A protein has these predicted regions:
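Bacterial carbohydrate/catabolite-sensing allosteric modules
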Residues: 1-165
Length: 165
């Protein structure tokens, strides 16, 4: 998501739920920092926003995003992103013309917003199935062949980002 946004933006915010969460907070923040570095963009703590995963928190964050001079955001939940989107609109900020948003759940919420949210599509069924198999092996004290599994994922371009050439 950051790599995509970095093609046309230098001030990319990271909007997340609690950063103490191992996966949703810590790991994603590390990925955000690494992607910024790879794109040649300096990390700024002032562009990291922590909240709850709620529409209301996203809406309230819009004003802080505007004040930060961010021009894009990676948001770690669709409901949170919908709040950001509507908060920006209510402050007169046009998405995607003035501000781009990419979210990460690909839930129905991302398709119901106007504009529709560009999102990272994740194979949630496969994620659950593989997790259950691994958990079952751990419970039966069986050896895990792999401790990390990378599942296919990709960007689903919708209308909260500008088209790239």
């Amino acid at each position: 998501a950051v790599t995509y946004l970095a093609k046309e933006n230098e001030r990319i915010a990271f909007v997340s739920g609690p950063l103490v969460d191992d996966i949703n907070g810590k790991v994603r923040l590390v990925g955000y920092k690494e992607a910024l570095k790879k794109a040649g963009i300096s990390y700024s703590e002032g562009l990291v926003f922590e909240s709850k995963y709620t529409y209301e928190d996203g809406y309230a964050l819009a004003e802080r995003l505007i004040s930060s001079n961010a021009t894009a955001a990676v948001v770690t939940g669709d409901e949170l992103a919908a709040g950001v989107l509507n908060g920006l609109a209510d402050h007169g900020v046009s998405v995607p013309e003035e501000f781009e948003i990419i979210t990460s759940d690909d839930s129905q919420v991302s398709r119901f917003t106007r504009p529709n949210l560009t999102t990272i599509a994740q194979p949630l069924y496969d994620l659950g199935a593989i997790s259950m198999r691994m958990l079952t092996k751990i419970m039966h004290k069986e050896e895990l062949e792999e401790r990390e599994v990378l599942l296919p994922h990709g960007l689903t371009e919708r209308r909260s980002t500008r088209k790239r050439k």
